[in-house]
Amino acid sequence: MPFVVVSLSLHASILEHMDALSQHYPGQSGVYILEKGEESLLTRAWLTESAQKTIDVQYFIWSTDNIGTLASEALLSAAERGVRVRVIVDDLLIDADPETLLSLDAHPNIQIKIYNPLHSVGRGTLSQLWHLITDFRDANQRMHDKVVIYDQTIAITGGRNMADEYYDYDHTYNFRDRDVMVAGSVLPRIQEGFNSFWQHPLSVSLTELLAEEKRDLTTEQVGSYTEWLHRYASDPLNFAPEIRIAITNMATRVEQIFTQLHWTEVDYLHDIPGKNKQRNNLGGGGQTTASLIELLSRAEKEVLIESPYLIMPEGGYDFFSGLLSKGVKVAIVTNSLASTDNLQAYSGYHKQKQKLLDLGISIYEFKPNPGIHRQLIDRYEQLGKTSPIFALHAKSLVIDGQITYIGTFNFDPRSANLNTEVGVVIDDSKIAHQVAQAIRRDMQPENSWDASVDIDQQGVGFLKRLQVDLWSLLPLDPIL
């Protein structure tokens, strides 16, 4: 079906845009792949500015760096114009202080909840250690979801958290990642997934976690922080020059994105809060794991996988051996030792790599200085800057040139058994071709080493290799 062009206005609601489009595609969902970090960031910014009723946010990481701070201000501005904002953030890596969190939560249109708060918010060091010792499994069960829903009409999900390095704005280290924007018939299921977390006891309100700090928080402190936040966002020095230009042109770019939505069949996968919490061990899987296994088991010709971490969980070898024995080609691109941000996870992969290669899986290891950076962030060359190094962070899967998964699931035991995960499954050859082309490009020699022939640990110093060897001695595989 040809694209339907709808004229957009910054002052019209997202809901109006999508109503005008979706009536032409009953029962289908619009899909747009967000490959570039800058485009994904600016699309989020525009949608946040345009939302009129609700914004629901679910993240594993929300940093206090430049991007995280600007995003917080954007949500505050939305709340100030009457938008209801609900935020769920996993507790593990929160680095904001209680006053900052409570000052945002103090706005009547903003509610913040913390998922499984056993580590950071409202916990002292002794409490953290106690929970880690006495409740090891629950302390390791994290919400890895990354979803933003605007006016219950448009959603973005994928690999990106809210921090500089996920949007190509860290000056030294960035992630090669992938998101997808969806609209249409899949939205009720995405909203249902968010609501299941929002209503669950594992998601605890800030006012409950920080009751004492809230009592001590003054109106002046709240006002001082919100004023500072608005000043920060309005200061052009806090935006790179290229971002200021991009923001100016964003209305035109978003109009192009909306007209390029591809309408097709889309499903949404999400785990329940706590995942397999009823189990007593570190295994057992979840709904996302089971769905991906079922999709993979139907493969007949080819499976392409992109995952920053590659550690086979229990049963993984036999499963992929079965695929390969029936003639399915399996190719995976993951991080090299030179590019990885997680030495513990790499140590698990390092122990398994030869066995995976012996099975017949083609493995490619992403380079820290891939040629693809020129396509992803060409502004560095334009501005005469030195490009930062890259690590792979995209989590995608293409089966038989027809089925595509884009989401948060890493191919490791932690995603399979511990962390809650989400993602969309798209049954469409055009989208599959687009994502497969991107994955194959990441596998090219200018972007990745062939793990079967290239020198292992190429260009990596002794200390980093030693760290991997030491991590490999520990029995950590179930939680990697």
Language-model region placement:
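Sec-dependent signal peptide recognition
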Residues: M1-P2
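Charged, low-complexity intrinsically disordered terminal segments
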Residues: V5-K146, Y150-L480
